Amino acid sequence: MTTAILERLSTLSVSGQQLRRLPKILEDGLPKMPCTVPETDVPQLFREPYIRTGYRPTGHEWRYYFFSLFQKHNEVVNVWTHLLAALAVLLRFWAFAEAEALPWASTHSLPLLLFILSSITYLTCSLLAHLLQSKSELSHYTFYFVDYVGVSVYQYGSALAHFFYSSDQAWYDRFWLFFLPAAAFCGWLSCAGCCYAKYRYRRPYPVMRKICQVVPAGLAFILDISPVAHRVALCHLAGCQEQAAWYHTLQILFFLVSAYFFSCPVPEKYFPGSCDIVGHGHQIFHAFLSICTLSQLEAILLDYQGRQEIFLQRHGPLSVHMACLSFFFLAACSAATAALLRHKVKARLTKKDS
């Protein structure tokens, strides 16, 4: 009996020693995290207006930038807002699919699946861009080009969902023929405009860069939201009782707020150096855009549930399949545009270094 107790105590002693060594093991396994640096210690390309500190140094190993997810720096809120939003979209859709016994192969479900895919894509591309862009100048351009591809994919995924699930009959009768082709073109134009502006203009950025970004994206938004805006306006004029229409209303409002903070560097413009880690405009843009996407998701799930009969009356399997194939065509065109401009950037950087 005594021997058994001594053996057990010996085992516990070894386990205790291992536990005491655990922090050291974890520390050795993680990369050494360099301190963040002020704007004067990073190249001009990485500097943001009115953001004085919190920059990650360039030129380190990839794992440093991945592990900077847990470091305090001026991009970490941008990363976490879209990471949490992506997880929320995924979990909400999974719960909906389980509760509704979603028919995955049904024609009726295809636009919904593409909308979910597009939402996860844009959120993931965005968080990767903000997490990894500090590695080098080429990485900076590459990941922001990927971000712009994600935005174009999300724009068209939203257009598909709005067209198939959310449009009312009066709007549909007038615009059904050219809405999706125009939405696909505007989605590509948004990606091309953002990529070109990133490639063409250097910091400090001129106003023309913002125009190249905002105008195509604004046109895409106006077109993509038109079926929803028309339905919401009619609903509110008639004393709206539709729950989905209220979610669509929130979607529009949150997007407009996010667009303001994307276009204007506030509040950091009025408090330079005070909003470096938390509170600058791009972080607020990310937060409101995430809430916009979650509101949009709720509205589309309600439309998917409640308007199936309208869907079946309007759309045959062939038209739905063709529209869904165009989603992947748009993604390929946007990716090709980004790859072309990345090639030009790489050639320019190589020439500069030689």
Swiss-Prot record:
Question: What's the short name of a Pfam family annotated to this entry?
Answer: HlyIII
Task: Name one cellular component (GO) term.
Answer: Golgi apparatus
Q: Which InterPro entries match?
A: AdipoR/HlyIII-related
Disulfide bond positions: none
A GO BP term here is: oogenesis
Q: Where are the transmembrane segments?
A: 76-96, 112-132, 175-195, 214-234, 244-264, 284-304, 320-340
Report membrane topology: Multi-pass membrane protein
State the source organism's domain of life: Eukaryota
Q: What does this protein do?
A: Plasma membrane progesterone (P4) receptor coupled to G proteins. Seems to act through a G(i) mediated pathway. May be involved in oocyte maturation. Also binds dehydroepiandrosterone (DHEA), pregnanolone, pregnenolone and allopregnanolone.
According to UniProt, the name of this protein is Membrane progestin receptor beta
> What is the protein's species of origin?
Homo sapiens (Human)
